[in-house]
């Protein structure tokens, strides 16, 4: 089991409270949404992976926001394409 200290992660984010929010969002992406880790897993839980990514400067609130906006754009584009296909009378 890996030991992770949050001090380096806090330095990357700025304060403990924002670090917790960022780590929770990223851990949820890994665990629930199936996003790939940006660091070696080493049989770690998603929260530990998220903290390691933050420590290395790979993840912050800005990168998570950008990723979320991109996902929304892709989902909206797929919905528009589906509606257009239905309107044209063909199925997907």
Swiss-Prot record:
GO CC annotation: DNA-directed RNA polymerase complex
Family from the record: Belongs to the RNA polymerase subunit omega family.
Keyword Nucleotidyltransferase on entry: yes
Protein name: DNA-directed RNA polymerase subunit omega
GO terms of molecular function: DNA binding; DNA-directed RNA polymerase activity
Native source species: Shewanella amazonensis (strain ATCC BAA-1098 / SB2B)
Oligomer and partners: The RNAP catalytic core consists of 2 alpha, 1 beta, 1 beta' and 1 omega subunit. When a sigma factor is associated with the core the holoenzyme is formed, which can initiate transcription.
InterPro entries according to UniProt: DNA-dir_RNA_pol_omega (IPR003716), Pol_omega/Rpo6/RPB6 (IPR006110), RPB6/omega-like_sf (IPR036161)
The entry's keywords: DNA-directed RNA polymerase, Nucleotidyltransferase, Transcription, Transferase
Catalytic activity entry: RNA(n) + a ribonucleoside 5'-triphosphate = RNA(n+1) + diphosphate
EC number: 2.7.7.6
EC main group: transferase
Summary of the function given for this chain in its UniProt record: Promotes RNA polymerase assembly. Latches the N- and C-terminal regions of the beta' subunit thereby facilitating its interaction with the beta and alpha subunits.
Membrane spanning stretches: none
Gene Ontology biological process terms, A to Z: DNA-templated transcription
The keyword Nucleotidyltransferase is assigned to this record: yes
Region forming the signal peptide: none
């Amino acid at each position: 089991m890996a030991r992770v200290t949050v001090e380096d992660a806090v330095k990357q984010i700025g304060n403990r409270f924002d670090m917790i929010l960022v780590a929770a969002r990223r851990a949820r992406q890994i665990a629930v949404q199936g996003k790939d880790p940006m660091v070696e897993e080493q049989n770690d839980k998603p929260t530990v992976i998220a903290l390691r990514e933050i420590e290395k400067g790979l993840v912050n609130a800005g990168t998570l926001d950008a990723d979320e906006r991109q996902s929304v754009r892709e989902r909206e584009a797929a919905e528009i394409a589906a509606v257009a296909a239905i309107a044209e009378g063909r199925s997907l």
